[in-house]
Every structure is written in C-alpha cells, then in structure tokens.
Design a protein with these regions (language model features):
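Conserved GNAT acetyl-CoA-binding A-motif
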Residues: 104-116
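Extreme N-terminal starter segment of soluble prokaryotic enzymes
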Residues: 1-2
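Residues forming the Rossmann-fold NAD(P)(H) cofactor-binding site
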Residues: 94
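Single conserved hydrophobic/aromatic residue that forms the stacking wall/gate
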Residues: 120-130
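Active-site acidic-Proline motif in GNAT/NAT acetyltransferases
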Residues: 84-86, 90, 118-119
Length: 130
C-alpha cells in the first residue's frame, strides 16, 4: 500500500471511493457537479489553493483519501477524509491526521478544523442502537 499525492487523473477513483463510503449511510449521496467539482481536477485544485490532497493506493486502486486547505488566518481545514470500509481499523486515517498535525505545527497553525454532517447514520450503527 502506498500513500502519495493525488493526481488529476485520480478524480474518478476518488469519486468512486466516496460513493462506496456513502453506501453505508441512509440518504447520503455525492453530487460531484454541484457539491464537489474539485474532485475532477483534485491535484490542481488543492495546489492552486495552497493545500494538498493524498490518496492511499493498494493494487492500483484508491482505498483512502484526505486533503487540507488553509482556513481563515491561522487554521487548516481537512477535506474529504475517506477510507474504504475494507481497509478501516488499520490506522490509515490516523496516519493522515498525524501528517496534518505535523504540517500545522510546521506552519504555526493554531487549529485544524473539519466540517461534517450528523444527519447521516450508518445502518450498522442503527442496528447496534436498536
């Protein structure tokens, strides 16, 4: 398994990864054209905004991703942290978060922020809580 910077040509695989992750959540979908057009040229988008976007690749398949962009004056914002469900619980997301923490320290950023939505719960979580 390899962690590397995303390339523009990775867009379709990243989109497919996110769609696979969303399958576990009710009423959750990815509308790339209206909500996430940056995924089509992911490398250029993040580079032009002074951020970075990484992907985990296993056997030529993207199985995880995450990016960051500067946010406000002294913060970094995490974007699109997704790990394929078959690769979870291996510390992959933790490694990405440690990378972001290191970058934040290097550039003397005060906070790392992440926006998420609490409307979506997985069927598995619903079953555990019933």
């Amino acid at each position: 398994m390899q962690l590397r910077l995303a390339r523009n040509k990775d867009g379709n695989q990243i989109i497919n990864l996110i769609k696979r992750c969303f399958k576990d959540y009710k009423n959750c979908y990815l509308d790339v054209d209206n909500d996430s057009p940056e995924l089509r040229d992911v490398y250029s988008y993040f580079k032009n905004k002074k951020g970075k976007f990484w992907v985990y690749v296993d056997k030529n398949k993207i199985i995880g991703c995450m990016g960051y962009l500067p946010h406000e004056k002294n913060n970094l914002e995490i974007h699109k942290l997704y790990i394929d469900k078959n690769y979870r619980m291996r510390g992959l997301a933790k490694k990405l978060m440690l990378r972001i923490e290191s970058i934040a320290k290097k550039y003397k950023k005060r906070k790392i922020v992440l926006w998420t939505c609490l409307l979506y719960t997985s069927d598995a979580a619903d079953e555990r809580n019933s």
